[in-house]
């Protein structure tokens, strides 16, 4: 790892650093962006469903601010078509990190007649209205999303 070199009475240690991988560079950029947004915006939010993309986003946010807590809240637009295990994992991850989670429900919009089921059964396109209304009503001024 390092080699001690004697120069007069001082000892210097030379350390060889491994070159950064492409993944290291991407991670560093993501951490920088999280910190920059925290400094420039009043109320950022991370979209968080408990899926793989949002888990990576939360991991990067935690890395950006460790050992302090992540200074953002989380928002999930629940389609109503999620596996119960994913929602359970989502809730456990949020609790483990000590964060607050807001949930906007597509089903609630359908139940109150503001949205209508699609003939093909997919609800992904229906997430737009609950998402934009949650962003506006909760006054988020920056939004992080994965995938």
List PLM regions with ranges.
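ATP-dependent adenylation/nucleotidyltransferase module used to activate substrates
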Residues: 2-147
């Amino acid at each position: 790892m390092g080699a001690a070199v004697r120069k007069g009475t001082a000892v210097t240690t030379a350390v060889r650093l491994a070159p950064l991988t492409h993944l290291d560079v991407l991670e560093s950029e993501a951490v920088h962006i999280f910190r920059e947004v925290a400094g420039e915006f009043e109320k950022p939010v991370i979209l968080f469903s408990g899926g793989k993309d949002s888990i990576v986003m939360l991991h990067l946010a935690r890395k950006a601010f460790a050992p302090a807590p992540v200074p953002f809240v989380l928002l999930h637009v629940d389609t109503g078509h999620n596996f119960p295990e994913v929602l359970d994992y989502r809730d456990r991850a949020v609790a483990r990190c000590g964060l607050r989670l807001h949930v906007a429900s597509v089903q609630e919009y359908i139940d109150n007649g503001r949205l209508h089921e699609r003939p093909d059964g997919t609800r992904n396109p229906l997430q737009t209205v609950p998402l934009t209304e949650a962003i506006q009503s909760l006054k988020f001024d920056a939004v992080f999303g994965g995938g």
